[in-house]
């Protein structure tokens, strides 16, 4: 469709807007990151809570289609979480979200059996799961601590917070300070992290960006790095900050700190310690929708890490996956195998300027 510059050109009360076909797909950390890891060759088990309703049936159907091993908990009292994504050409997506059953997910919902052989536990998103952010994140800390003590490496992603909601009143800096010692690989977006650590700075970014995408006006040294440094001080072992179209920022702690990560991950500590990179995005073949680009690039990064790749290669594959994802309307159909991505990268795939 026709590109727009501002959302108020589109959403006007009383106006009828003709739109394209609806794409019904699963989303979020379990379906986007989890299924993408499976497509990219990872051995994954998917865990989440859904309602006994039509949306829950769709979720089960999608996971079945991908032959993914799922351990979905079905609630008779809660509805399946859903999101309406407004993906208009020319602007970032807008999300209308109902957390549903995700609000009632607890640490004890993770089967003990699943933790026995797992190398990595990836979790998202505490920001839109009421059980996880209440009481300064007590349940989140309990869960991450339990997983870590079971000998599993941990990674965590965030989602945007609706400032006017209950989650918007949470002291997120305090929650992050409490949970970070139990997070090995922290993979939020730079805007989400800034909102949590420094609301004033976040406000300033939005004002500076005016109607543009915030990530386009950020300076790595002045804007991104200070936030990354704070996370590392809080106890994160590795940090991958998604910075939108420009790319991703990665940094890691010392060899001594990385050696605390579970041996099941088989991480080459020498290769991964004390690194810092800004990985520019690759130019996509086309841009249809940003849906799932962050989640799937994280999936590629984590899969590459568990495959024994170097940080440089993991970042190339993550950036390549993000660029492949945006070439389709949904999160998964644009994904390419690591083999295809490596060929494309070796052939000189162009980076964004």
Regions found by a protein language model. Name each.
Residues 2, 22, 61-78, 85-284, ...:
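Ribokinase/PfkB-type carbohydrate-kinase core domain
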Residues 324-333:
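Short arginine-rich
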Residues 35, 42, 194-197, 249, ...:
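Short, small-residue alpha-helix embedded
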Residues 201, 306-307, 327:
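Amphipathic alpha-helix from the class-I
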Residues 29-32, 55, 79-82, 295-298:
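Short glycine/serine/threonine-rich phosphate/pyrophosphate-binding segments
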Residues 27, 242-245, 292-294:
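A short acidic Gly-Thr/Ser loop motif
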Residues 47-49, 73:
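Structural motif
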Residues 1-47, 54-65, 90, 268-275, ...:
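Glycine-rich phosphate/adenosyl-contacting loop at the front of the ribokinase-like
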